[in-house]
Regions:
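Conserved small/polar residues in nucleotide/adenosyl-binding loops
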Residues: 126-128
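Conserved SAM-binding loop of SAM-dependent methyltransferases across substrates and taxa
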Residues: 81-94
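Short alpha-helix immediately C-terminal to the canonical SAM-binding loop
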Residues: 106-108
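A structural micro-motif
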Residues: 16, 72, 95, 120-122
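Short, conserved SAM-binding/catalytic segment
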Residues: 111-122
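Conserved class I S-adenosyl-L-methionine
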Residues: 70-78
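Conserved SAM-binding motif I beta-strand of class I
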Residues: 96-101
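Class I SAM-dependent transferase core
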Residues: 2-69, 115-117
Length: 128
């Protein structure tokens, strides 16, 4: 769904060298986001380039702005569709995430997304 070559180049320009597996995970994320968004409104941004830049690349800027030690535990309060924490997790697999949101429909989406990305063992979901 996303243009992985374009996204890889944009990420590299910001200092993020993405592996083939990471690019696959970003593509899976984008596909599932658009698919699920047809049933439940998660985002207004659903075009491939918009997802690459406004969701994924912008989310990765967290890793440039905040120094997170190896294995850091991070909580994303009001996570919505998982931005910026899930893209950061794709790049930094060592992070332990807790995603907290007030809408259960988002938690359901994130639960399925974490399974699809193989992150269910290092990601916790909380509905408040």
């Amino acid at each position: 769904m996303i243009d992985t070559a374009r996204f890889s180049a944009a990420a590299a320009a910001e200092g993020f060298e993405l592996t083939a597996r990471q690019l696959e995970q970003f593509d899976q994320y984008a596909q599932f986001l658009v698919e699920y968004n047809e049933k439940v409104n998660l985002t207004a941004i659903t075009d491939p380039e918009g997802i690459e830049v406004k969701h994924f690349l912008d989310s990765l800027m967290l890793l440039k702005a905040v120094e997170l030690p190896e294995g850091a535990s991070v909580i994303d309060v009001g996570t919505g569709a998982g931005f910026p924490s899930v893209p950061a997790k794709i790049v930094r697999d060592d992070l332990r995430l807790t995603l907290l949101d007030g809408l259960n429909k988002r938690i359901v989406f994130l639960g399925e997304l974490s399974r699809r990305l193989g992150q269910e063992n290092t990601l916790s979901l909380i509905h408040i």
